[in-house]
Amino acid sequence: MKHTIFTLIFLSCTLVYGCGAGPKKPKKTTSHSTQTTASEGRVVPARYGFRVVAELPHSTSAYTQGLQWEDGVFYEGTGLNGRSELRIVNPATGEAVKSVSLERKYFGEGITILGDKIYQLTWTAGKAFVYDKATLRKVGEFSYEGEGWGITTDGKSLYTSDGTDRIVVRNPQTFKTERTIEVRMAGRKVNMLNELEWIGGEIWANVYMTDQIVRINPESGAVVGIVDLTGLQAPSDKRWQDDVLNGIAYNPATKALFVTGKNWNKVYQIELTKDGD
């Protein structure tokens, strides 16, 4: 499983900055793709704490890999072989009102919604599945190289992570690479980028096996903010080592921000606070 492979890597790295020996992503070379390096890499990112606004129930059987808010419900992608699903979840109860299961051979990963379609990645199978948003009926699939971790959209393109410091921008019609973003903070790589969410023109990314979310400028790749969620979930509520923070959802209409984790018993609506507030 992903958590066992990367725990030792994580323990040997500085929190958030990552290390140069993270999981390797096969190199892609296409005539159309370009690469964006963080020209703002020396900018000192703003630091944020949090305030809990509300607590919502969450299924402790949901190994959360992707979370999105739309039309008053959560869309959630879960992982683990034999347990991976795509769900529509009632936020008041935490129960799935509709779901589809992936074949046992697939380890589900991040999800995002673009128009009337939902895109779901898989970890190592090199497959992305496309579903009708209303029915959850699978309507297509794409193949890609390397691993799939997180995915989000700016409403036009798709952005995917693979556990390295890179975010790949993809054409939603073909899944082909349009460009690659290298994420940097103070000039150093930020590895282990996991679940992604597009918020206010930025990419927000969970940093796997940490309590931190980094806010990324999608043009330069520079980290412009760090959200520290240490203490959000009580240690006593975590049953396993890999019950880590993973899952960011945002309601642009109300600016409500939601976060959760793998097998957590709650989804938290939070507000950010600046350090010192």
Q: For the regions a protein language model found, what residue spans apply to each?
A:
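Bacterial signal peptide processing site
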Residues: 20-23
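Signature of short aromatic-glycine-proline-rich micro-motifs recurring in repeat-based ectodomains
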Residues: 64, 193, 240-250
